[in-house]
């Protein structure tokens, strides 16, 4: 059976940065308030003319260049996003067009902040079951600044824009992706938008019950790690690096405390990027590799939770 591994990573962050102090000039908040409750210091904001597909393409180009392959060799493109350019066609096919990946098939995955975990799982499954696929391009890309209510200080301080990408390769006998686990529970009301194409005719803005999200995030992310360890006969001490969804430093710290896992082995980019939804995990992964934190042979666990609720994990040897 063919197995998959992550061959390369790439990322893209818009040039414009928005500090906490700048947000404090828009809504009633402060740098201290945001830092203490979220760990966020700044976030990147897409330019007016930038589209989600543009962010995705830039991240993809970086990953493809590092993989040392041509766009013609890519067989599959999956884009995880909640902020596509259009209702249709998919963001993935727009990315395909912009990259000129003529030999790939492409589609989107929508699982909110868990989207990249879902997309990697789907790509891994397709690689294992389809001999046609040698190289898969998986991207998480979001422009969250377009769906936040900039008058709601409980949500507008949390989100940022960006994109991260990986090139996954199929190879007989080699396994980078060890296991994946996906979950959802239909608890849709605690984190959602207040609109949609079939209900209001527009995308709506983000609405969130922060306390409920925090409680569910800590419990479900912890359980996801424990289930992954159990399924693979591992102990928490076997994990070299944990990359959690970069939503809030308090959630990350609470999960790490429950797992009795050293914070020094947790990748944290929430201060730099804020919550970039489906882009969060690939951005953090690329950052950790570029900073020489994650090295070849390391056992890495990716975990995320998002609206739906959806959550899951990917365990991999890098």
Curated annotation (Swiss-Prot):
Q: Does the keyword Transcription apply?
A: no
Q: State the UniProt keywords alphabetically.
A: Acyltransferase, Cytoplasm, Fatty acid biosynthesis, Fatty acid metabolism, Lipid biosynthesis, Lipid metabolism, Multifunctional enzyme, Transferase
Coarse class of the primary localization is cytoplasm
In its UniProt record, which GO terms are filed under biological process?
Answer: fatty acid biosynthetic process; secondary metabolite biosynthetic process
Q: Quick check: keyword Ubl conjugation in the entry?
A: no
The broad enzyme category this protein falls into is: transferase
Q: Its catalytic activity?
A: malonyl-[ACP] + acetyl-CoA + H(+) = 3-oxobutanoyl-[ACP] + CO2 + CoA
Provide the protein's localization: Cytoplasm
Among the entry's GO cellular component annotations, what is one?
Answer: cytoplasm
> What pathway does the annotation place this protein in?
Lipid metabolism; fatty acid biosynthesis
Any transmembrane segments, and where? Answer: none
Q: What is its EC number?
A: 2.3.1.180
Q: Where is this region: ACP-binding?
A: 246-250
Q: Which GO terms describe its molecular function?
A: 3-oxoacyl-[acyl-carrier-protein] synthase activity; beta-ketoacyl-acyl-carrier-protein synthase III activity
SUPFAM superfamilies per record? Thiolase-like
Catalytic site: 113, 245, 275
Quaternary structure, per UniProt, is: Homodimer.
Q: Give the comment on domains.
A: The last Arg residue of the ACP-binding site is essential for the weak association between ACP/AcpP and FabH.
Q: What function does the entry list?
A: Catalyzes the condensation reaction of fatty acid synthesis by the addition to an acyl acceptor of two carbons from malonyl-ACP. Catalyzes the first condensation reaction which initiates fatty acid synthesis and may therefore play a role in governing the total rate of fatty acid production. Possesses both acetoacetyl-ACP synthase and acetyl transacylase activities. Its substrate specificity determines the biosynthesis of branched-chain and/or straight-chain of fatty acids.
Belongs to which family? Belongs to the thiolase-like superfamily. FabH family.
Its protein name is Beta-ketoacyl-[acyl-carrier-protein] synthase III
Species assigned in the record: Wolbachia pipientis wMel
Which gene is annotated as encoding this protein in its UniProt record? fabH
